[in-house]
UniProtKB/Swiss-Prot annotation:
Organism of provenance: Ehrlichia chaffeensis (strain ATCC CRL-10679 / Arkansas)
GO process annotations (BP): 'de novo' pyrimidine nucleobase biosynthetic process; 'de novo' UMP biosynthetic process
Residues engaged in binding substrate: 11, 33, 60-69, 117, 179, 187, 207-208
UniProt-recorded name of the protein: Orotidine 5'-phosphate decarboxylase
Annotated metabolic or biological route of this protein: Pyrimidine metabolism; UMP biosynthesis via de novo pathway; UMP from orotate: step 2/2
Length: 231
């Protein structure tokens, strides 16, 4: 059975534009992603306004703080019943366990961010991480699996390695950094939708290629057609 893997990233602080896109993409994408830019501008009420359009929400806040702070923040966010919420796996085991406890009873699934797609080997070394992105993602995916997170966020470059170790029942793979050409913007580890799906992705986070398109609906349809044989 075909499952729509597209999550459209609404990386904007313009709520009217976000509402317009969400209504336009209703029934055509699996979720819309709201990030820190939107949440800082509009908070819980802004997220609720988008949710009222009927499209499931992927709230990408990448929470990373001491366990108690993250736990209390999630207790507040849980009332929104978003589909997925991100935390940083590098926040550690205790932080993730407390986060899982706080989300208990909610429909929200916790997803762990591993290595940002804006980072490469040299960036990791600058912050004291000597492993390659693949090695670091594998280390963090193991921790995420042990804690019981629903899935992880990783680039398509690491997805194949993770999928070779863990089945879809173990960890869902949410893959950002999806591009169609050489325009990578501020991301370094990027691949096409088809390549990401073949690597084992369950969800593709796609922003600018859709939101900056002259015809977002047609762009989504084109993406779905390009990956239909990979599902």
């Amino acid at each position: 059975m075909f499952t729509n893997p597209i999550i459209c990233a609404l990386d904007t602080h313009d709520i009217n534009h976000a509402l317009l896109l969400t209504k336009m993409l209703y029934g055509r994408v699996s979720m819309v992603k709201l990030g820190l830019e939107f949440f800082t501008a509009y908070g819980l009420s802004g997220v609720q306004a988008i949710a009222d359009c009927g499209v499931p929400i992927f709230l990408d806040l990448k929470l990373h703080d001491i366990p108690n702070t993250v736990s209390k923040a999630i207790s507040v966010i849980a009332s929104l019943n978003v589909a997925m919420l991100t935390i940083h796996v590098s926040g550690g085991r205790e932080m993730m366990i407390r986060a899982m406890d706080s989300i208990s009873g909610s429909v929200t699934k916790l997803v762990g961010v591993t290595v940002l797609t804006s980072m490469d080997d040299s960036d990791l070394k600058e912050i004291g991480v000597n492993e390659s992105p693949v090695q670091q993602v594998m280390l963090l995916s193991k921790l995420a699996r042990e804690v019981g997170l629903y899935g992880i966020v990783c680039s398509a470059f690491e997805a194949k390695e993770v999928r070779n170790r863990y089945t879809e029942k173990d960890l869902k793979l949410i893959v950002p950094g999806i591009r169609f050409d050489s325009d990578c913007n501020d991301q370094k580890r990027v691949k096409s939708p088809k390549d990401a799906m073949l690597a084992g992705a369950n969800y593709l986070v796609i922003g600018r290629p859709i939101t900056m398109s002259s015809d977002p609906v047609q762009t989504v349809e084109d993406i779905l057609l390009s990956i239909s044989k990979c599902i």
